[in-house]
Regions:
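OB-fold ssDNA-binding interfaces and closely related basic DNA-contact patches used
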Residues: 1-122, 183-191, 195
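Compact mixed alphabeta submodule
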Residues: 91-206
Length: 206
């Protein structure tokens, strides 16, 4: 898979520069809609109408008006959530090419603080950028979330050494992140929502 997930413990990654100069891609997804792994929100991503947003907002308002915690909880599950994606090289696995790392707001803010820090500057620069040490902690108790700690290396380094991997091939393997997700029209999203709601009603009726 082009997507990379950190493993428990420490690993070193390098964020790779993109053609448009922005290696931190932001997308909004709806989760918990049936068995769909994540639906791109037409409204938050593209400024189009989104039936899931409309339904979740209506559900939330009803929950507030009727003081119904169940409705509010269901609405929260359906609200669009923000995820960030960056092309990376995993040190020691350069031969696997450029992969895509998905992460949340906290990791994004940490990375941004390094980018804006003049001591580091452009951490993605191919000649004098900075590797990031990522420490991933798998949760020990059910219901808790994994933790991601990020720390830049003290010294800048080159993105790629030809002794380790074919650098031209590595750069050419940078995926266009926008193309990795299926974009649904408003009517497509309505169908997905209707399917989810009808299956939900059916399961409740059993």
């Amino acid at each position: 898979s082009v997507f990379w997930r950190p493993e428990d413990g420490e690993q070193t990654i390098r964020i790779v520069p993109t053609a448009d100069g922005d290696p931190f891609k932001e997308f909004h997804f709806h989760y918990n809609v049936g068995k769909n792994p994540g639906i791109l929100c037409p409204k938050r991503n593209y400024g189009e109408e989104c039936p899931i947003c409309d339904f979740a907002s209506k559900l939330w308002r009803e929950g507030v008006e009727k003081n119904d915690d169940t409705s509010k909880r269901e609405a929260k599950k359906l609200f669009a959530r923000k995820r960030y994606y960056s092309p990376i090289v995993v040190r020691g696995e350069e031969s696997k090419g450029v992969r895509v790392w998905a992460y949340g707001k906290t990791a994004y803010e940490t990375l941004l603080s390094y980018v804006l820090d003049p001591d580091y500057g452009d951490i993605t620069h191919p000649e004098n950028g900075t590797d990031i040490v990522l420490t991933y902690t798998v949760p020990g108790t059910p219901g808790s979330f994994p933790k991601t700690a990020l720390k830049p290396r003290r010294r800048p380094s080159v993105l790629c050494d030809d002794d380790v991997a074919d650098c031209d091939e590595l750069i050419n393997s940078i995926p266009e992140i926008e193309t990795l997700f299926q974009r649904h029209s408003t009517s497509d999203v309505q169908v997905l929502l209707d399917d989810y709601l009808s299956s939900d009603v059916t399961s409740e009726g059993l």
